[in-house]
Amino acid sequence: METTAVLRGVRLSEQKGRLVADQIRGLPVERALNLLAFSPKKAAVIIRKLLESAIANAEHNEGADIDELKVSRIYVDRGPSLMRTSARAKGRGNRIVKPTCHILLTVGDKASNKK
């Protein structure tokens, strides 16, 4: 049994998101929540909320036990970039790129992960 939570269009670069995602991949959800709670990164706050949502989905929709859940998959993919311009000297302009990303997090019980 696996349950998925998806967050799209997050104002975060995918590279910074992957640093946090790699730390919690494969961990039990209790340990992953503790690790994210004490991480100083912006991505940790975002991924922690998404993990709590995935846990709630698993409990409510599937009737899963929290103690049996672990982070089976987490992907951080590139989303569309926001483009802004900054005025420069002599009538020129520079582009400011504000990256976004999509995060997909799947939690599953330990029995389904052994398959």
Curated annotation (Swiss-Prot):
Work out whether the entry's keyword set contains Ribonucleoprotein. Answer: yes
Q: Per the record, GO CC terms?
A: cytosolic large ribosomal subunit
Q: Which keywords does this chain's UniProt record carry?
A: Ribonucleoprotein, Ribosomal protein, RNA-binding, rRNA-binding
Annotated signal sequence range: none
In this entry, which stretches build a coiled coil? none
GO function terms (MF aspect): rRNA binding; structural constituent of ribosome
Which one GO biological process term can you cite for this protein? Answer: translation
Xref: InterPro entries: Ribosomal_uL22, Ribosomal_uL22_bac/chlpt-type, Ribosomal_uL22_bac/org-type, Ribosomal_uL22_sf
User: rRNA-binding among the record's keywords?
Assistant: yes
- Which top-rank group of organisms is this from? Bacteria
Family classification = Belongs to the universal ribosomal protein uL22 family.
Q: How does it assemble?
A: Part of the 50S ribosomal subunit.
NCBIfam families registered for this protein in UniProt: rplV_bact
Q: What is the recorded function of this protein according to its Swiss-Prot or TrEMBL entry?
A: This protein binds specifically to 23S rRNA; its binding is stimulated by other ribosomal proteins, e.g. L4, L17, and L20. It is important during the early stages of 50S assembly. It makes multiple contacts with different domains of the 23S rRNA in the assembled 50S subunit and ribosome. The globular domain of the protein is located near the polypeptide exit tunnel on the outside of the subunit, while an extended beta-hairpin is found that lines the wall of the exit tunnel in the center of the 70S ribosome.
What is the protein name given in its UniProt record? Large ribosomal subunit protein uL22
Source organism of the structure: Nitrosospira multiformis (strain ATCC 25196 / NCIMB 11849 / C 71)
Q: Which gene encodes it?
A: rplV
